[in-house]
Amino acid sequence: MSLMQFSGLLVVWLLSTLFIATLTWFEFRRVRFNFNVFFSLLFLLTFFFGFPLTSVLVFRFDVGVAPPEILLQALLSAACFYAVYYVTYKTRLRKRVTDVPRKPLFTMNRVETHLTWVMLMGIALVSVGIFFMHNGFLLFRLHSYSQIFSSEVSGVALKRFFYFFIPAMLVIYFLRQDSKAWLFFLVSTVAFGLLTYMIVGGTRANIIIAFAIFLFIGIIRGWISLWMLVAAGVLGIVGMFWLALKRYGLNVSGDEAFYTFLYLTRDTFSPWENLALLLQNYDNIDFQGLAPIVRDFYVFIPSWLWPGRPGIVLNSANYFTWEVLNNHSGLAISPTLIGSLVVMGGALFIPLGAVAVGLIIKWFDWLYELGNRETNRYKAAILHSFCFGAIFNMIVLAREGLDSFVSRVVFFLVIFGACLLVAKLLFWLFDCAGLVHQRAKPQPQTQVEG
């Protein structure tokens, strides 16, 4: 890459970043937080944060990358995607009405809410316990990270239930919403994340999500300022780099440490070059249509329920890894949101996907606003826990693609909804048995004048 080509890419990157950052800043000033703000920051991180890292790798360490014209296409496609997404998100097809009372779809009481978070936490802890009994601490047993996907590890499906610990802790926080509950959320979820990191063998998702939710709650409540958020972000990047070194068993120093930091940070937070690789091999892609979305549900179907279930699921990530990169190491490499759309239907699917994502984020913001307006604090805690608990799925959306997001958000909805239904059933049984008692309201103290 010549300096002239880099200069052209830099101009496009600066304009695109300024465009998205400006819209995000205006939205932040207006509402302080909603899921449009979160997705916009996540989109910036995924598709634009990595450009400076790539530039240093190219000019400092002479690392090979895709041709400049392909990198330009990747930057422009990301900017155009966001423009279509933003217009979709902001467009209203009918007048907003907030004063018309509507019959609530469901309601919650104190006992049902506590039963819900206990079951969510129980699902996570029991799954971790069973996985640990089968495999022990994989971080200290396995020699390479790719081994966690091998036949040496049993009970892999249980990992999908670990994440429900976070929504359980979110319910506890939203019932109190004070600084002590906020700090308790951080300590409990990060401790659980570190435990699963050691048990699973290097998976950092629970730690990243817990820390991100903690920061956004702090922003919403005014406990964290913007400069503190930036400082925490830098600390998070360094922390994730250290965990990555431990995960891959790397011992580096000097220039090698700087090089390792650059490419691991880029791959962890901003795999934008994967989109460029897909665009570089565009003519060789056999478009998969909507099949990757359907196939991604296969992993949630137990083999005893479907004996003939395919052992290999060809979703967009695996198609990118196996067919485009010809990588059969056992790891699935993230194609990114836009990359998954390219795999499914080429350039035509990019604006269609942007419209779909705009509607998805709008739906989450509708739920979030519903929780903000809710007068029943127990129902509000459940709604907010569901919305913030789905942040993990939004990160999957940006990094892994639309197919992975759809299957995971449906799975999350089913398990979360099942816990709500079971909680209501248990409350009904307890109530029928006379085990539920109303809390006595404290009597007002009367002051006796002497």
Swiss-Prot record:
Please tell me one Gene Ontology term that the record gives under cellular component.
plasma membrane
Q: Which UniProt keywords apply?
A: Cell inner membrane, Cell membrane, Membrane, Transmembrane, Transmembrane helix
Localization (cell):
Cell inner membrane
Against Pfam families, the record matches this protein to: WzyE
Pathway listed? Bacterial outer membrane biogenesis; enterobacterial common antigen biosynthesis
The answer to whether UniProt assigns keyword Lipoprotein to this entry is no
A GO BP entry: enterobacterial common antigen biosynthetic process
- What's the superkingdom here? Bacteria
Coiled-coil positions are none
Keyword set includes Glycoprotein: no
Q: Which HAMAP family match?
A: WzyE (MF_01003)
Q: How does it assemble?
A: Probably part of a complex composed of WzxE, WzyE and WzzE.
What's this protein's function? Probably involved in the polymerization of enterobacterial common antigen (ECA) trisaccharide repeat units.
Family the UniProt entry places it in: Belongs to the WzyE family.
The name on file for this protein is: Probable ECA polymerase
Gene name per UniProt: wzyE
